[in-house]
Structure formats: C-alpha cells, structure tokens
Amino acid sequence: EQRPLCNECFICDRSGDPRCLCEDHVPQCHEGCHQCEKVDTRSGTTMYQCRSFEYYDCAN
C-alpha cells in the first residue's frame, strides 16, 4: 500500500508506522483522508488540507 507523502508534517509520530498531521495544501485530499478541509490561498486557488491524523510517509 502506497501512502501519501507529506512535505510539511505538523505533528509526526515515528514510533511504528509513521503517522502525521499534514499541513500540505493539495488540489484534492487522498481517498483515505477522514477530515478534508477547504483552504483559501493568497492566489485565490482553492486547495484542500487533510486535518485528520493519517498514515503518511513523512518527507521531512
């Protein structure tokens, strides 16, 4: 199973499977996201952010 990659992890738990609260703004939340929120950006482009504690691969 390939997990989404998070570039800006807000909180990361690396014990066992890495899990994090991801701060990335994306065009569409991944299908496993349980709490997807719309984010208004400075450019006016509508983006989304997954606000649930998910199994991400932490890039940082």
UniProtKB/Swiss-Prot annotation:
Gene3D superfamilies named among the record's database cross-references: Cysteine Protease (Bromelain) Inhibitor, subunit H
One term under GO cellular component: extracellular region
InterPro entries according to UniProt: Bowman-Birk_prot_inh, Prot_inh_BBI
Disulfide bond recorded as keyword: yes
Site (Reactive bond for trypsin): R14, S15
Molecular function GO terms recorded: serine-type endopeptidase inhibitor activity
Keywords: Disulfide bond, Protease inhibitor, Serine protease inhibitor
Disulphide-bonded residues: C6-C22, C12-C20, C29-C36, C33-C50
Function: Serine protease inhibitor.
Similarity annotation: Belongs to the Bowman-Birk serine protease inhibitor family.
Name the UniProt record assigns to this protein: Bowman-Birk type proteinase inhibitor B2
Organism: Hyacinthus orientalis
Taxon lineage: Eukaryota, Viridiplantae, Streptophyta, Embryophyta, Tracheophyta
